[in-house]
C-alpha cells in the first residue's frame, strides 16, 4: 500500500511539473534585424543608356507593334506594412543553392529563384493575361515562331549593373549546357535556337517547333 501511495504521489508530482513546464514561457522573444542588405557596387544612372536609340529599345521607345500592359492586378496588398519577421515552413533542406542544375529542384531553391530573379513576363493573378516583368514589351511573329522582348532599361542587378539583352542569352546558354547535369532543361530549352541580342535592350528568339507553349515557357521562365 505504501508503495502504491508513493507511486501515486510521484505520478502527481511529475504531471504537475509537466503542466508547469508547458505554461507560458518567460523567455524573451528573439529580436530579428530587418534592416535592408545591399551589395551595390555600381551607381548606374536610372533610365536607358543614352547611346541606345528609341528604335532599339532606348529612351523614347514607343512600342508600336508591340504588346504591353500598364493596368493589371498584383498579388498582395499594397497597403501591407513593410518590415518585421515573416515565419514560414520549409519542407526540405537544399542539397545545393544553385537554381539550375543537379539537385536544384527543391522548395528552397525555387523560392530563392523567384525572390532573386525576375522572369521576362508574368501573368495577371486575376485575368491570367501576360504582364510586364523584366521585359516591358513583347512581340510575336505572324508564324508564331519568333518572339521579341524589350528589357526594362531601369532593370538593375543587385550590384547596380544594368540588366541587358545579353544576360538573357547567357541564361539560355547555361540552360542548354550538358555540364549542369539537368536533362530536362537541356531538352526544353534546346527546342529554341540561340537567342539574339538585337540591341542592348531587345532580345529575340526563334522556336524550332510550332507550339503555343513555346512562348509560355520562354517568357515565363527565362531570366
Label the model's feature ranges.
Residues 186-223:
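Surface-exposed binding/hinge segments that line
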Residues 18-21:
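C-terminal motif of bacterial Sec signal peptides marking the signal peptidase cleavage site
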Residues 23-25:
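Bacterial signal peptide processing site
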Residues 53-74, 84-142, 173:
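N-terminal lobe/hinge region of extracytoplasmic solute-binding protein
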Residues 28-81:
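N-terminal pre-domain segments of enzymes
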Residues 136-181, 204-206:
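Aromatic- and charge-enriched surface segment that lines or borders ligand/interaction sites
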Residues 81-85, 115, 133-135, 142-146, ...:
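Extracytoplasmic
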Residues 1-9:
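Bacterial N-terminal signal peptides that target proteins for export
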Amino acid at each position: 500500500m505504501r508503495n502504491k501511495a508513493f507511486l501515486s504521489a510521484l505520478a502527481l508530482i511529475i504531471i504537475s511539473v509537466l503542466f508547469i513546464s508547458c505554461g507560458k514561457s518567460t523567455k524573451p522573444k528573439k529580436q530579428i534585424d530587418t534592416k535592408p542588405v545591399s551589395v551595390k557596387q555600381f551607381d548606374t544612372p536610372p533610365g536607358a543608356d543614352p547611346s541606345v536609340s528609341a528604335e532599339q529599345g532606348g529612351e523614347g521607345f514607343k512600342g508600336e507593334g508591340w504588346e504591353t500592359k500598364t493596368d493589371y492586378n498584383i498579388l498582395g496588398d499594397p497597403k501591407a506594412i513593410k518590415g518585421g519577421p515573416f515565419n514560414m515552413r520549409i519542407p526540405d533542406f537544399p542539397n545545393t543553392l544553385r537554381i539550375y542544375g543537379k539537385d536544384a529542384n527543391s522548395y528552397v531553391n525555387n523560392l530563392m529563384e523567384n525572390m532573386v530573379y525576375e522572369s521576362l513576363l508574368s501573368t495577371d493573378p486575376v485575368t491570367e493575361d501576360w504582364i510586364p516583368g523584366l521585359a516591358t514589351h513583347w512581340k510575336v511573329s505572324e508564324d508564331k515562331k519568333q518572339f521579341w522582348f524589350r528589357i526594362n532599361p531601369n532593370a538593375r542587378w543587385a550590384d547596380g549593373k544594368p540588366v541587358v539583352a545579353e544576360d538573357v542569352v547567357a541564361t539560355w546558354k547555361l540552360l542548354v549546357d550538358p555540364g549542369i547535369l539537368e536533362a530536362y532543361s537541356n531538352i526544353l530549352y534546346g527546342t529554341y535556337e540561340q537567342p539574339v541580342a538585337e540591341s542592348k535592350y531587345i532580345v529575340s528568339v526563334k522556336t524550332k517547333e510550332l507550339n503555343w507553349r513555346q512562348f509560355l515557357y520562354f517568357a515565363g521562365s527565362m531570366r
